[in-house]
Amino acid sequence: MLDPNSRYVSRLTRDTMALILAGGRGSRLHELTDWRAKPALHFGGKFRIIDFPLSNCVNSGIRRVGVLTQYKAHSLIRHLVRGWSHFKKELGEYVEILPASQRYSPNWYQGTADAIYQNLDIILDEAPKYVMVLSGDHVYQMDYGSMLAYHVETGADLTVSCIEVPIEEAAGAFGVMTVDDNNRILRFDEKPKHPTELNDMPGMTLASMGNYIFNTEFLFEQLRADAENPESEHDFGKNIIPAIIKNSNVRAYRFRDHETDRASYWRDVGTLDSFWLANMELVEPSPQLNLYNQDWPIWTYQTHLPPAKFVFDDDDRRGYAVDSMVSGGCIVSGGKVSKSLLFSDVHVHSYTDLEESVVLPNVQIHRHAKIKRAIIDSGCEIPEGMVIGHDHEHDTARGFRVTKKGVVLVTREMLGQLTPK
């Protein structure tokens, strides 16, 4: 493999344009995405999911980026304008927002491939040698330069980034691949009920991460052919990739940690349980996702907030947090916070007990509340004395959503308050 830090890779990234698919709702997140697209969802105390693929682009040296939006995009667009508009267009750097605008058809984006097809004129104007198509709703840290080097080294027409996952986890959830000994893709199945087992890893299958590198001319050919096919759903995983495997050089790039030779960190966070768990992993002493790695920072919009504050140390009340992440603007006023994430501007009032919970921005939790294993959506005001997560039958009766694994989602609408911004 070519040295990922070489000037060679720098030239490859300069010849690359990235298009991030950020128009999905994330329906398995239920009410959490009623008012926002999944890529706009908060994650990790201060970030949004879209910040991860964008940061990967910047850190990899890819500075021509388009973000394709569609479903309830207001909060996503606002975040991109505030946090990702600092590039120098005159130097060929930009993050541009590409909403569905019916360029090539009277329809909005009809699928992942159609979304790229409807922006062919923009790609043509930029004339990149390679086009990287990225999913905008996954959490991971990845050097795309290494994948580009692999793509060129193998002479691939298309390279698909992939990761080894347990078969039971992939069934019905991910596109999976069958590969030969050289990682050439022999078969691609979109969300099969019975994924193909890896020969070298029993119990595991090779799942698509939803990231693709195309040679630009090859991409144009496939998109135009797909657009003319009335039977197609215009989706990369369902239509384009299965159709080109036989007669094209399509490769799988395994996303692995070279130091441990194991699968690298990658989370789909597509369900309430997986979203809650991925956040909870971050409060562990040494989580696999290192948000403190200065060599690979996650960039985001920085709000101007005061430091977090913890007050009261009386016999009957003490404001503190343990095994937790607490963001700027938070005040823990005589309450207990354990194994939880508090996003910005959260106020935990006296005598409150908050445990194993993810609290999104601008939340007020009033006195004597008891909350366990919950996701509290932005802008909620938890009334005094409210108990959440300790009696699931009662939670369900009040209109809260309780997952199969016992995580409770609370939104403003469920509390009878105003709809989220």
Swiss-Prot record:
Homotetramer. It comes from Teredinibacter turnerae (strain ATCC 39867 / T7901). InterPro entries: ADP-Glc_PPase, ADP_Glu_pyroP_CS, GlgC_bac, GlmU/GlgC-like_hexapep, NTP_transferase_dom, Nucleotide-diphossugar_trans, Trimer_LpxA-like_sf. Pathway: Glycan biosynthesis; glycogen biosynthesis. Its EC number is 2.7.7.27. It catalyses: alpha-D-glucose 1-phosphate + ATP + H(+) = ADP-alpha-D-glucose + diphosphate. Pfam families: Hexapep_GlmU, NTP_transferase. GO terms for molecular function: ATP binding; glucose-1-phosphate adenylyltransferase activity. This is Glucose-1-phosphate adenylyltransferase. Keywords: ATP-binding, Carbohydrate metabolism, Glycogen biosynthesis, Glycogen metabolism, Nucleotide-binding, Nucleotidyltransferase, Transferase. Belongs to the bacterial/plant glucose-1-phosphate adenylyltransferase family. It is an enzyme of class 2 (transferase). Involved in the biosynthesis of ADP-glucose, a building block required for the elongation reactions to produce glycogen. Catalyzes the reaction between ATP and alpha-D-glucose 1-phosphate (G1P) to produce pyrophosphate and ADP-Glc. CDD domains: ADP_Glucose_PP (cd02508), LbH_G1P_AT_C (cd04651). Alpha-D-glucose 1-phosphate binds at Y109, G175, E190, K191, S208. One of its GO terms (biological process) is glycogen biosynthetic process.
